[in-house]
From Swiss-Prot:
Species this chain originates from: Methanosarcina barkeri (strain Fusaro / DSM 804)
Localization per record: Cytoplasm
Active site: C145
PANTHER family attached to this UniProt entry: N-ACETYL-GAMMA-GLUTAMYL-PHOSPHATE REDUCTASE, CHLOROPLASTIC-RELATED, N-ACETYL-GAMMA-GLUTAMYL-PHOSPHATE REDUCTASE, CHLOROPLASTIC-RELATED-RELATED
An MF annotation (GO) of this entry: NAD binding
Any one of the GO CC terms: cytoplasm
Function: Catalyzes the NADPH-dependent reduction of N-acetyl-5-glutamyl phosphate to yield N-acetyl-L-glutamate 5-semialdehyde.
Protein name in UniProt: N-acetyl-gamma-glutamyl-phosphate reductase
Membrane-crossing residue ranges in chain numbering: none
Pathway named in the protein's UniProt entry: Amino-acid biosynthesis; L-arginine biosynthesis; N(2)-acetyl-L-ornithine from L-glutamate: step 3/4
Protein backbone atom coordinates (compact mmCIF):
# COMPACT_ATOMS: atom_id res chain seq x y z
CA UNK A 1 0.00 0.00 0.00
CA UNK A 2 1.11 3.56 -0.74
CA UNK A 3 1.30 5.53 2.50
CA UNK A 4 -0.05 9.02 1.82
CA UNK A 5 0.12 12.24 3.79
CA UNK A 6 -1.71 15.51 3.24
CA UNK A 7 -0.16 18.75 4.44
CA UNK A 8 -2.89 21.33 4.89
CA UNK A 9 -5.78 18.90 5.08
CA UNK A 10 -8.44 21.10 6.69
CA UNK A 11 -9.45 23.08 3.58
CA UNK A 12 -11.61 22.17 0.61
CA UNK A 13 -8.84 20.63 -1.51
CA UNK A 14 -7.50 18.76 1.52
CA UNK A 15 -10.95 17.44 2.28
CA UNK A 16 -11.43 16.34 -1.31
CA UNK A 17 -8.08 14.52 -1.23
CA UNK A 18 -9.24 12.70 1.89
CA UNK A 19 -12.61 11.80 0.33
CA UNK A 20 -11.02 10.37 -2.80
CA UNK A 21 -8.13 8.60 -1.07
CA UNK A 22 -10.13 6.98 1.72
CA UNK A 23 -11.43 4.30 -0.69
CA UNK A 24 -8.44 4.21 -3.05
CA UNK A 25 -7.52 0.52 -3.35
CA UNK A 26 -3.76 1.15 -3.27
CA UNK A 27 -3.50 3.90 -0.64
CA UNK A 28 -3.35 4.02 3.14
CA UNK A 29 -3.93 7.47 4.61
CA UNK A 30 -1.04 7.91 7.01
CA UNK A 31 -1.42 11.48 8.20
CA UNK A 32 -3.29 14.74 7.76
CA UNK A 33 -1.76 17.94 9.04
CA UNK A 34 -3.14 21.19 10.39
CA UNK A 35 -1.22 23.51 12.68
CA UNK A 36 -4.31 25.07 14.23
CA UNK A 37 -6.30 21.84 14.60
CA UNK A 38 -3.55 19.44 15.76
CA UNK A 39 -5.00 16.77 18.04
CA UNK A 40 -8.57 17.16 16.83
CA UNK A 41 -10.32 14.52 14.69
CA UNK A 42 -10.18 15.11 10.96
CA UNK A 43 -13.94 14.52 10.93
CA UNK A 44 -14.42 17.59 13.13
CA UNK A 45 -13.99 19.66 9.96
CA UNK A 46 -14.85 17.04 7.32
CA UNK A 47 -18.06 15.64 8.71
CA UNK A 48 -18.88 13.81 5.48
CA UNK A 49 -16.03 11.40 6.28
CA UNK A 50 -17.54 10.24 9.58
CA UNK A 51 -17.33 6.44 9.73
CA UNK A 52 -14.77 6.31 6.91
CA UNK A 53 -11.74 7.89 8.53
CA UNK A 54 -10.21 7.59 11.99
CA UNK A 55 -7.40 10.14 11.95
CA UNK A 56 -6.51 13.12 14.09
CA UNK A 57 -4.85 16.20 12.69
CA UNK A 58 -1.12 16.37 13.39
CA UNK A 59 1.61 18.97 13.14
CA UNK A 60 4.75 16.88 12.48
CA UNK A 61 8.02 18.16 11.10
CA UNK A 62 9.15 17.45 7.54
CA UNK A 63 11.55 14.69 8.58
CA UNK A 64 8.77 12.78 10.35
CA UNK A 65 6.46 13.22 7.36
CA UNK A 66 9.16 12.02 4.96
CA UNK A 67 9.87 8.92 7.05
CA UNK A 68 6.20 7.94 7.32
CA UNK A 69 4.93 8.70 3.82
CA UNK A 70 5.57 7.39 0.32
CA UNK A 71 3.72 10.36 -1.17
CA UNK A 72 2.83 13.77 0.20
CA UNK A 73 0.18 16.12 -1.16
CA UNK A 74 0.80 19.79 -0.43
CA UNK A 75 -2.57 21.53 -0.08
CA UNK A 76 -1.13 24.72 1.37
CA UNK A 77 -1.35 28.40 0.40
CA UNK A 78 0.78 29.79 -2.41
CA UNK A 79 4.23 30.64 -1.08
CA UNK A 80 4.14 27.93 1.60
CA UNK A 81 4.91 24.80 -0.41
CA UNK A 82 8.46 25.96 -1.12
CA UNK A 83 9.15 25.69 2.61
CA UNK A 84 8.35 21.95 2.60
CA UNK A 85 9.56 20.68 -0.76
CA UNK A 86 13.36 20.64 -0.23
CA UNK A 87 13.18 18.48 2.91
CA UNK A 88 10.40 16.23 1.63
CA UNK A 89 12.35 15.43 -1.53
CA UNK A 90 15.50 14.67 0.46
CA UNK A 91 14.76 10.95 0.30
CA UNK A 92 12.40 8.65 -1.58
CA UNK A 93 9.15 10.49 -0.88
CA UNK A 94 7.17 11.63 -3.91
CA UNK A 95 5.46 15.03 -3.77
CA UNK A 96 2.43 16.46 -5.56
CA UNK A 97 2.15 20.20 -4.93
CA UNK A 98 -1.33 21.69 -5.31
CA UNK A 99 -0.11 25.26 -4.75
CA UNK A 100 1.21 27.54 -7.49
CA UNK A 101 4.79 27.56 -6.21
CA UNK A 102 6.29 25.36 -8.92
CA UNK A 103 3.84 25.64 -11.83
CA UNK A 104 5.67 28.50 -13.54
CA UNK A 105 9.23 29.47 -14.31
CA UNK A 106 10.70 31.02 -11.15
CA UNK A 107 10.98 34.54 -12.56
CA UNK A 108 7.38 34.40 -13.82
CA UNK A 109 6.13 33.10 -10.47
CA UNK A 110 7.88 35.91 -8.60
CA UNK A 111 6.43 38.51 -10.97
CA UNK A 112 2.87 37.17 -10.88
CA UNK A 113 2.63 36.28 -7.19
CA UNK A 114 4.95 38.91 -5.74
CA UNK A 115 6.81 36.32 -3.67
CA UNK A 116 10.55 35.70 -3.65
CA UNK A 117 11.07 31.99 -4.36
CA UNK A 118 13.30 30.26 -1.82
CA UNK A 119 13.61 26.99 -3.76
CA UNK A 120 13.81 27.61 -7.52
CA UNK A 121 13.67 24.11 -8.95
CA UNK A 122 11.83 22.65 -11.92
CA UNK A 123 8.73 20.49 -11.67
CA UNK A 124 6.69 18.80 -14.36
CA UNK A 125 3.36 20.56 -14.89
CA UNK A 126 0.91 17.85 -13.90
CA UNK A 127 -1.69 18.08 -16.64
CA UNK A 128 -1.50 14.42 -17.58
CA UNK A 129 -3.28 14.87 -20.91
CA UNK A 130 -0.36 17.05 -22.04
CA UNK A 131 2.45 15.73 -19.85
CA UNK A 132 2.39 11.93 -19.51
CA UNK A 133 6.03 12.17 -18.42
CA UNK A 134 4.76 12.70 -14.87
CA UNK A 135 4.96 8.90 -14.65
CA UNK A 136 8.76 9.19 -14.38
CA UNK A 137 8.82 11.98 -11.81
CA UNK A 138 9.11 12.26 -8.03
CA UNK A 139 7.83 15.84 -7.94
CA UNK A 140 4.84 17.24 -9.82
CA UNK A 141 3.24 20.69 -9.81
CA UNK A 142 -0.52 20.22 -9.95
CA UNK A 143 -2.21 22.71 -12.33
CA UNK A 144 -4.59 25.44 -11.27
CA UNK A 145 -8.34 24.97 -11.66
CA UNK A 146 -9.01 27.67 -14.28
CA UNK A 147 -6.00 26.67 -16.40
CA UNK A 148 -7.10 23.03 -16.41
CA UNK A 149 -10.46 23.81 -18.02
CA UNK A 150 -9.03 26.39 -20.40
CA UNK A 151 -5.96 24.49 -21.55
CA UNK A 152 -7.89 21.28 -22.17
CA UNK A 153 -10.41 23.25 -24.24
CA UNK A 154 -7.76 24.72 -26.54
CA UNK A 155 -4.83 22.27 -26.55
CA UNK A 156 -5.78 20.25 -29.66
CA UNK A 157 -6.02 23.37 -31.83
CA UNK A 158 -2.93 24.94 -30.28
CA UNK A 159 -0.91 21.79 -30.93
CA UNK A 160 -2.06 21.90 -34.57
CA UNK A 161 -0.87 25.51 -34.86
CA UNK A 162 -4.35 26.71 -35.79
CA UNK A 163 -5.09 29.38 -33.17
CA UNK A 164 -4.56 33.07 -33.90
CA UNK A 165 -6.39 34.60 -30.90
CA UNK A 166 -7.72 32.81 -27.81
CA UNK A 167 -10.34 34.29 -25.48
CA UNK A 168 -11.35 32.32 -22.38
CA UNK A 169 -14.43 33.20 -20.35
CA UNK A 170 -14.70 31.04 -17.21
CA UNK A 171 -17.41 30.75 -14.56
CA UNK A 172 -16.47 29.18 -11.22
CA UNK A 173 -18.37 27.97 -8.20
CA UNK A 174 -17.86 29.53 -4.76
CA UNK A 175 -15.59 26.77 -3.45
CA UNK A 176 -12.87 28.06 -5.78
CA UNK A 177 -12.41 30.98 -3.39
CA UNK A 178 -11.36 28.63 -0.59
CA UNK A 179 -12.77 27.89 2.82
CA UNK A 180 -12.54 31.45 4.20
CA UNK A 181 -15.35 33.74 2.96
CA UNK A 182 -14.50 36.71 0.78
CA UNK A 183 -16.60 39.58 -0.53
CA UNK A 184 -17.09 37.73 -3.81
CA UNK A 185 -18.08 34.45 -2.13
CA UNK A 186 -20.25 35.90 0.66
CA UNK A 187 -23.78 34.56 0.10
CA UNK A 188 -25.70 37.89 0.15
CA UNK A 189 -23.36 39.30 -2.49
CA UNK A 190 -23.36 36.28 -4.80
CA UNK A 191 -26.85 34.80 -4.55
CA UNK A 192 -28.79 35.41 -7.80
CA UNK A 193 -25.74 37.26 -9.09
CA UNK A 194 -22.58 36.84 -11.12
CA UNK A 195 -19.35 38.59 -10.18
CA UNK A 196 -16.51 39.10 -12.69
CA UNK A 197 -13.13 39.85 -11.18
CA UNK A 198 -9.51 40.47 -12.21
CA UNK A 199 -10.77 41.07 -15.72
CA UNK A 200 -7.40 41.28 -17.47
CA UNK A 201 -4.82 40.28 -14.87
CA UNK A 202 -5.82 37.02 -13.20
CA UNK A 203 -2.68 35.15 -12.23
CA UNK A 204 -3.93 31.85 -13.69
CA UNK A 205 -3.56 33.37 -17.15
CA UNK A 206 0.20 32.80 -16.87
CA UNK A 207 -0.30 29.03 -16.72
CA UNK A 208 -2.60 29.08 -19.73
CA UNK A 209 -0.04 31.10 -21.69
CA UNK A 210 2.83 28.85 -20.60
CA UNK A 211 1.15 25.63 -21.67
CA UNK A 212 -0.46 26.80 -24.89
CA UNK A 213 2.70 28.53 -26.11
CA UNK A 214 4.52 25.32 -25.24
CA UNK A 215 2.32 23.65 -27.83
CA UNK A 216 2.44 26.52 -30.34
CA UNK A 217 5.37 28.86 -29.80
CA UNK A 218 3.95 31.73 -31.88
CA UNK A 219 0.63 31.94 -30.01
CA UNK A 220 0.76 35.14 -27.97
CA UNK A 221 -2.73 36.68 -28.02
CA UNK A 222 -4.28 34.80 -25.08
CA UNK A 223 -7.00 36.43 -22.99
CA UNK A 224 -8.71 35.21 -19.81
CA UNK A 225 -11.51 36.61 -17.63
CA UNK A 226 -13.07 34.73 -14.68
CA UNK A 227 -16.45 35.11 -12.98
CA UNK A 228 -17.88 33.71 -9.74
CA UNK A 229 -21.36 32.20 -9.96
CA UNK A 230 -23.75 31.07 -7.18
CA UNK A 231 -22.81 27.40 -7.47
CA UNK A 232 -20.75 25.43 -4.96
CA UNK A 233 -18.64 23.43 -7.41
CA UNK A 234 -17.57 23.54 -11.01
CA UNK A 235 -15.85 25.59 -13.68
CA UNK A 236 -17.55 26.20 -17.01
CA UNK A 237 -15.29 27.68 -19.68
CA UNK A 238 -16.32 29.17 -23.01
CA UNK A 239 -13.29 29.43 -25.27
CA UNK A 240 -13.52 31.67 -28.35
CA UNK A 241 -10.66 30.50 -30.53
CA UNK A 242 -10.09 32.57 -33.66
CA UNK A 243 -8.33 30.33 -36.15
CA UNK A 244 -5.83 30.83 -38.95
CA UNK A 245 -7.98 28.90 -41.37
CA UNK A 246 -11.64 28.04 -41.73
CA UNK A 247 -12.63 24.86 -39.93
CA UNK A 248 -15.84 22.85 -39.90
CA UNK A 249 -17.36 21.14 -36.90
CA UNK A 250 -16.43 17.82 -38.51
CA UNK A 251 -12.82 19.01 -38.69
CA UNK A 252 -12.96 19.80 -34.98
CA UNK A 253 -14.36 16.37 -34.17
CA UNK A 254 -11.45 14.72 -35.94
CA UNK A 255 -8.83 16.97 -34.32
CA UNK A 256 -10.17 16.67 -30.77
CA UNK A 257 -10.92 12.96 -30.80
CA UNK A 258 -7.49 12.17 -32.19
CA UNK A 259 -5.67 14.45 -29.73
CA UNK A 260 -7.46 12.96 -26.73
CA UNK A 261 -7.39 9.37 -27.93
CA UNK A 262 -6.87 7.03 -24.94
CA UNK A 263 -7.31 9.89 -22.45
CA UNK A 264 -9.96 8.38 -20.15
CA UNK A 265 -11.03 11.54 -18.34
CA UNK A 266 -11.85 13.54 -21.48
CA UNK A 267 -15.42 13.08 -22.67
CA UNK A 268 -17.34 14.50 -25.61
CA UNK A 269 -21.03 14.60 -24.62
CA UNK A 270 -23.71 14.53 -27.30
CA UNK A 271 -24.94 17.95 -26.20
CA UNK A 272 -23.22 20.83 -24.47
CA UNK A 273 -21.34 20.10 -21.23
CA UNK A 274 -22.95 20.81 -17.88
CA UNK A 275 -21.53 21.32 -14.41
CA UNK A 276 -23.91 18.79 -12.88
CA UNK A 277 -22.63 16.09 -15.25
CA UNK A 278 -19.08 16.37 -13.88
CA UNK A 279 -19.72 17.33 -10.25
CA UNK A 280 -17.74 15.13 -7.87
CA UNK A 281 -15.89 13.45 -10.76
CA UNK A 282 -12.50 13.75 -12.45
CA UNK A 283 -13.94 14.17 -15.94
CA UNK A 284 -13.55 17.11 -18.29
CA UNK A 285 -16.46 17.31 -20.71
CA UNK A 286 -15.82 19.17 -23.96
CA UNK A 287 -17.96 20.23 -26.91
CA UNK A 288 -17.27 22.52 -29.86
CA UNK A 289 -18.86 24.30 -32.79
CA UNK A 290 -17.32 26.03 -35.79
CA UNK A 291 -18.25 29.58 -36.78
CA UNK A 292 -17.05 29.59 -40.39
CA UNK A 293 -18.17 33.15 -41.08
CA UNK A 294 -15.73 34.57 -38.53
CA UNK A 295 -13.01 31.90 -38.54
CA UNK A 296 -13.97 31.25 -34.94
CA UNK A 297 -14.32 28.06 -32.96
CA UNK A 298 -16.38 27.98 -29.76
CA UNK A 299 -15.22 25.30 -27.34
CA UNK A 300 -17.04 24.56 -24.10
CA UNK A 301 -15.49 22.69 -21.19
CA UNK A 302 -16.84 21.69 -17.79
CA UNK A 303 -14.89 20.37 -14.81
CA UNK A 304 -15.33 20.06 -11.07
CA UNK A 305 -12.90 22.64 -9.72
CA UNK A 306 -12.14 20.56 -6.61
CA UNK A 307 -11.64 17.26 -8.46
CA UNK A 308 -10.23 17.55 -12.00
CA UNK A 309 -9.30 21.14 -11.11
CA UNK A 310 -7.39 20.14 -7.97
CA UNK A 311 -7.50 16.98 -5.83
CA UNK A 312 -8.64 14.43 -8.41
CA UNK A 313 -5.98 15.59 -10.82
CA UNK A 314 -3.40 15.33 -8.02
CA UNK A 315 -4.39 11.69 -7.45
CA UNK A 316 -4.34 11.07 -11.21
CA UNK A 317 -0.72 12.27 -11.11
CA UNK A 318 0.06 10.13 -8.08
CA UNK A 319 -1.33 7.05 -9.81
CA UNK A 320 1.04 7.46 -12.74
CA UNK A 321 3.99 8.30 -10.48
CA UNK A 322 3.52 4.91 -8.77
CA UNK A 323 2.92 2.92 -11.94
CA UNK A 324 -0.84 2.56 -11.45
CA UNK A 325 -3.57 3.07 -14.01
CA UNK A 326 -4.42 6.77 -13.97
CA UNK A 327 -8.09 6.00 -13.29
CA UNK A 328 -7.38 4.05 -10.10
CA UNK A 329 -9.61 5.32 -7.30
CA UNK A 330 -11.08 7.97 -9.61
CA UNK A 331 -13.31 6.04 -12.00
CA UNK A 332 -16.71 7.12 -10.77
CA UNK A 333 -19.67 9.00 -12.24
CA UNK A 334 -20.72 12.47 -11.20
CA UNK A 335 -23.25 13.14 -8.46
CA UNK A 336 -25.93 14.65 -10.73
CA UNK A 337 -28.36 16.28 -10.28
Amino acid sequence: MIKAGIIGASGYTGGELLRLLVNHPNVKLELATSRSLAGKPVTSTHRHLEGFLDLNYENPDSEDIRERCDVVFLAVPHGSAMNYVPELLDGNTKVVDLSADYRLETSEFEKIYGIKHSDPRNAVYGLVELHPEVAKENFVANPGCFPTGSILAAAPLAAAGLIDIAVFDSKTGISGAGISPTQNSHYPNLAENIIPYKLTAHRHRAEIVQELTGLEGKLRNINFTPHVIPSIRGIFTTAHLFTKETLSTDDLKTIYEEFYRDRPFIRFPSGVPSLTAVRGSNFCDISFEADKENNRVVVLSAIDNLVKGASGQAIQNMNLMFGLDETCGLWMPATAP
